[in-house]
């Protein structure tokens, strides 16, 4: 941070609290108030960091004229709904998992794959799935998941294809169908 600031770069930090070393030397600091991250590999502030980056992007979009005030306000309204919707999403995820628990837990590896913005979702899903039920998992971009690893997929691999109905929807459906029909271990 010191070197970047000395070189004339505009710098900003996001930390769990105001008393961290980075917060104290940062010319612009955002306090996430997520609590102490006792272990470096635990990222309790990840979701808060993502949300803050999104909010900054919205504000910059408004300031630079890429968003109208009405669009900006609508996005802010959506953001305000997140805490309340979290409980419902958690319950839906639990119900989804319970209905598929046997299939998932008998698999030696869970593979998440998705196109476009769902690639990031597949990576995060793989991390969370390894953390929570503690089953080895990996995330691929849809194209990667179709052309390389699919020759190695077998009934031990549960491939979860994320599909938002976008331009890669047919490819996503094709991979899911292949895993369901040939290897009997795919979900969409």
For the regions a protein language model found, what residue spans apply to each?
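Well-ordered alpha-helical segments embedded in enzymatic catalytic cores
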Residues: 52, 95-99, 145
């Amino acid at each position: 941070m010191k070197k970047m600031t000395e070189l004339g770069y505009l710098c900003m930090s996001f930390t769990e609290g105001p008393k961290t070393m980075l917060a104290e030397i940062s010319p612009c600091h955002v306090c996430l108030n997520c609590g102490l991250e006792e272990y470096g590999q635990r990222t309790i502030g990840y979701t808060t960091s993502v949300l803050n980056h999104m909010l900054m992007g919205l504000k910059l979009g408004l300031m630079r004229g890429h968003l109208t005030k009405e669009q900006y306000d609508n996005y802010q309204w959506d953001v305000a709904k997140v805490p309340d919707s979290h409980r419902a999403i958690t319950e839906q995820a639990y119900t989804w998992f319970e209905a598929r628990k046997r299939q998932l837990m008998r698999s030696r590896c869970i593979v998440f794959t998705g196109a476009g913005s769902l690639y990031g979702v597949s990576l995060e899903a793989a991390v969370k799935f390894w953390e929570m039920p503690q089953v080895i998992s990996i995330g691929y971009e849809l194209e990667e998941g179709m052309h390389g690893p699919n020759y190695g997929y077998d009934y031990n691999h549960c491939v979860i294809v994320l599909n938002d109905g976008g331009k890669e929807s047919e490819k996503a459906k094709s991979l899911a169908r292949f895993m369901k029909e040939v290897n009997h271990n795919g979900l969409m």
